[in-house]
UniProtKB/Swiss-Prot annotation:
It comes from Prochlorococcus marinus (strain MIT 9211). Transmembrane segments: none annotated. The gene is chlN. The lineage of its organism: Bacteria, Bacillati, Cyanobacteriota, Cyanophyceae, Synechococcales. This is Light-independent protochlorophyllide reductase subunit N. The keyword Ribosomal protein does not apply. InterPro entries: LIPOR_BchN/ChlN, Nase/OxRdtase_comp1, Protochl_reductN. It catalyses: chlorophyllide a + oxidized 2[4Fe-4S]-[ferredoxin] + 2 ADP + 2 phosphate = protochlorophyllide a + reduced 2[4Fe-4S]-[ferredoxin] + 2 ATP + 2 H2O.
Length: 418
């Protein structure tokens, strides 16, 4: 680890739950359906986050736990079987059904793993039924994707072919560009996970080299490693430098000549740095405080410091996997304060004490902090925005310059009016 100082905190948290990941997963795999076993609050959360009206028949829904279920007066498993049968009768195009656990279903101990096994035997291969937890009791919102991908891994076919596997949901256009770069480097067998169709799972084996695109896929990385795959250590593909090092990690693993890597990436890097310039001018010297929510905080901090010149006051992260994050930690400046976990009141006190120019935080904290005069950026925006890769570096920087620009405009307007 670099010279960063690490502090652990426990206490009250302010994060979304893992159900939120359904929003981007259901868009990624249009032949899959996500059935949350939860409360009306769970249903409202997903519908609001996705911005989809329920009459549009989205590829997610909620099996509502009523008071009778919570009190143990009804057989929740019988009710779940009935809901699933009705759903699959009405939506025969569903190829994969995820039963997604929630806080209520976990509190009353509904065994969704057993339910999935039972329903798989009933439907006899017509649809694949998997389960994972989206509960927020012990996890944060991005870990929903980790749970979903981990559930897929046992179904992935075995293969001995040498291949590169990109793991983690990316915007389709971004993924296509990255695959094109790898093919220019002579890496022909490139696949992605999750796939764009849930039935088209990539193969896995001892000749599979894995590049993680997201830092929150700890469990998925572990089970892929158990299947024989090699996880390539690299920073995550955020910003010019992170993306370059990420691509070079794959190139080195496939014995690609460094001169080819340089000639392929150099035009992209020059263009990206030119596009970054106006945002660097806005961000350089500004003080940054990241509250924990998405697990993207450390790669984002590295990008904003190394490439945009921001001063890092504190990096909060819900969980810190030191092995997975070592390439990122090694790039941070000495004495960077990293806080794993959260005691939200103590962290807010430190925000007020340090007076940052920009706070990256969850939606629930943004408005109160704005009311206190701080500029904020929602961390959830980083998950829904196409920010990965060299070409996207300026778009990523723009996301952080916007609130500062807005703050300047508001101050100018107030001065003019007075």
């Amino acid at each position: 680890m670099s010279g960063a100082s690490l502090l652990k905190e426990t206490g009250p948290r302010e994060v979304f739950c893992g159900l939120t990941s359904i929003v981007w997963l259901h868009r990624r795999m249009p032949d899959a359906f996500f059935l949350v076993v939860g409360s009306r609050t769970c249903a409202h959360l997903i519908q609001s986050a996705a911005g989809v009206m329920i009459f549009a028949e989205p590829r997610f829904g909620t099996a509502i736990l009523e008071e009778r279920d919570l009190a143990g007066l009804a057989d929740a498993h019988e009710e779940l079987d009935r809901v699933v049968k009705n759903l699959l009768t009405r939506r025969p195009e569903i190829r994969t059904l995820f039963l997604v656990g929630s806080c209520p279903s976990e509190v009353i101990k509904i065994d969704l793993a057993r339910a999935a096994e039972r329903l798989n035997s009933q439907f006899n291969g017509k649809v694949t039924i998997l389960n994972y937890s989206g509960s927020g009791i012990e996890t944060t919102f991005t870990q929903g994707e980790d749970g979903a991908l981990k559930a897929f891994v046992p179904l992935m076919p075995s293969s001995d072919k040498k291949q590169l596997l990109l793991v983690g949901t990316l915007a389709n256009a971004v993924e296509d560009r990255l695959i094109t770069i790898f093919k220019r480097l002579g890496i022909e067998n490139v696949d992605s996970f999750p796939p764009r169709q849930s039935t088209e799972l990539p193969s896995i084996g001892p000749e599979t080299k894995v590049l993680l695109t997201q830092p929150y896929l700890t469990d998925t990385a572990r089970v892929l490693k158990d299947r024989g795959a090699e996880i390539l250590p690299a920073p995550f593909p955020l910003g010019v430098e992170g993306s370059r090092l990420w691509i070079e990690a794959a190139a080195k693993s496939f014995n690609v000549d460094q001169s080819l890597v340089t000639s392929t990436l150099e035009p992209l890097i020059l263009r990206a740095r030119k596009a970054l310039k106006p945002y660097i001018e806005k961000l350089t010297g500004k003080k940054l405080f990241l509250l924990p929510e998405s697990q993207l905080e450390i790669p984002l901090a590295r990008f904003l410091h190394m490439e945009c010149g921001m001063e890092l006051l504190e990096i909060g992260t819900p969980y810190l996997n030191r092995d997975m994050m070592k390439p990122e930690l090694d790039l941070l400046p000495d004495k960077t304060r990293i806080v794993e976990g959260q005691h939200v009141e103590k962290q807010l006190d430190r925000v007020r004490k340090n007076q940052p120019d920009l706070v990256v935080c969850g939606m629930g904290l943004a408005n109160p902090l704005e009311a206190e005069g701080f500029s904020t950026k929602w961390s959830i925006e980083m998950v829904f925005s196409p920010i990965h890769g060299i070409d996207q570096a300026s778009d990523l920087a723009e996301l952080f310059s916007r609130p500062l620009h807005r703050h300047d405009l508001l101050n100018t307007k107030q001065l003019t009016s007075t």
